[in-house]
Each structure stands twice: as structure tokens, then as C-alpha cells.
């Protein structure tokens, strides 16, 4: 199967599902059997999964150390990951490793322990990100939570399982003008 055919078929493939496995560290995935659904996972000749979805929700992960290496061991084309579900874990930050998956369009991070709203800035480099969840994290309590996320990630169409409307975008822009100070341009002084 060539890469183009893979891209066309793997979107409909079932996810590689490690949810509800009490996984503490990413490396444990290598020795863990994924959950099975109604449709079996397709595998490459090398035995790796042919899917673009990885579900790690409802575990006890507190970091994503070695995520890239493990994804490469489990998936035939980890660079094509389009959906990662890390909801209901113990993550305290958005790990920069997630920003290396440029095809990521769905990212679930709800129900974790992410404190700081500024963590969202890391996701701005993901050009295809369209659906994001962050509710149930301490950051949700920060003033302007929804507006900040929509300003930082203007290309998302669904946030916390709610569609992003034109009114949401307008409100976010007004909020941005009122709350985010523009960076001042530095003026170089002539040192003659």
C-alpha cells in the first residue's frame, strides 16, 4: 500500500485504543494490548497499526516522555496522526512533542491538571488543528479562558465539544483588543 492510499484509507480505520488501561508511562504501551472494537485494526507487513488515531484517555499519564519513539514502534506512519485523545490523565502541561504532529486535527486534553492558560500557545504551530478540548483542567477557571484559546488558535472550529460561531470569534477579538497588549517594536538607537 503506497502512502497516498494509506492516507485515504486510514482515516476510516478504527483507532489504536489504549484507553482505560491504567497506563502510567508511555513506554508501557509497547507491552500492552490495545482494546479491540467491532472492526479489527489493520496492520502493515511489519505489524504496525495503519491508523491515524491514537486513544490514550482515562489512564494515569503525567508526562509524554518518549511519545515519538513509542508512536514509531506502534504506528506505520506516526507522522500522519490526525487524532490524539489524552483526556482524563494527570498531565500538568501541554508537552511540546504534540506540536511535532503537523497533521493533528483533533486533540483531546480535557480532564487533566493543566494549570496555565499560556500552555495553549504551544498549539499555535499546528496548522490542521480543528477540534480541541481543554475543559476540566484548572486553566478553565482563568478569566477569558474561551476567548484566549480562540484568539490563540483562530483556525479551530470546535472547542470543548462546542462549535465555534462567528459571534464567538467576534467576542474573542474584542476580548483580545481589551486584554492583550500588542508587542512594542524596539527602536534601535544609533550608537555613533
Curated annotation (Swiss-Prot):
A GO cellular component annotation in the UniProt record: axoneme
LRR repeat ranges per the UniProt record: 49-71, 80-101, 103-124
Pfam families the record matches: LRR_9 (PF14580)
UniProt cross-references to Gene3D superfamilies, sorted A to Z: Ribonuclease Inhibitor (3.80.10.10)
Domain LRRCT: 137-175
Cell compartments where the protein resides: Cytoplasm
Keyword terms: Cytoplasm, Leucine-rich repeat, Repeat
Keyword Lipid metabolism carried by entry: no
More info: LRRC51 and TOMT were originally considered as alternative reading frames, LRTOMT1 and LRTOMT2 of the same LRTOMT gene in primates.
Official protein name in the record: Leucine-rich repeat-containing protein 51
Origin species: Macaca mulatta (Rhesus macaque)
The organism's taxonomic lineage, starting at the top: Eukaryota, Metazoa, Chordata, Craniata, Vertebrata
This protein's encoding gene: LRRC51
Amino acid at each position: 500500500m503506497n502512502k497516498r492510499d494509506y492516507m485515504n484509507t486510514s482515516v476510516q480505520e478504527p483507532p489504536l485504543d489504549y484507553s482505560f488501561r491504567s497506563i502510567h508511562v508511555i513506554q508501557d504501551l509497547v507491552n500492552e494490548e490495545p482494546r479491540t472494537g467491532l472492526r479489527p485494526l489493520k496492520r502493515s507487513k511489519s505489524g504496525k497499526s495503519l491508523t491515524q488515531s491514537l486513544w490514550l484517555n482515562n489512564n494515569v499519564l503525567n508526562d509524554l516522555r518518549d511519545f515519538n519513539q513509542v508512536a514509531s514502534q506502534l504506528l506505520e506512519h506516526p507522522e500522519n496522526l490526525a487524532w490524539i485523545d489524552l483526556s482524563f490523565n494527570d498531565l500538568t502541561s501541554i508537552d511540546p512533542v504534540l506540536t511535532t504532529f503537523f497533521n493533528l486535527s483533533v486533540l483531546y486534553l480535557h480532564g487533566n491538571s493543566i494549570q496555565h492558560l499560556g500552555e495553549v500557545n504551544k498549539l499555535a504551530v499546528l496548522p490542521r488543528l480543528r477540534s480541541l478540548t481543554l475543559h476540566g483542567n484548572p486553566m478553565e477557571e482563568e478569566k477569558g479562558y474561551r476567548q484566549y484559546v480562540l484568539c490563540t488558535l483562530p483556525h479551530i472550529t470546535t472547542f470543548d465539544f462546542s462549535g465555534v460561531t462567528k459571534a464567538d470569534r467576534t467576542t474573542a477579538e474584542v476580548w483580545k483588543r481589551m486584554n492583550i497588549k500588542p508587542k512594542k517594536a524596539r527602536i534601535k538607537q544609533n550608537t555613533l
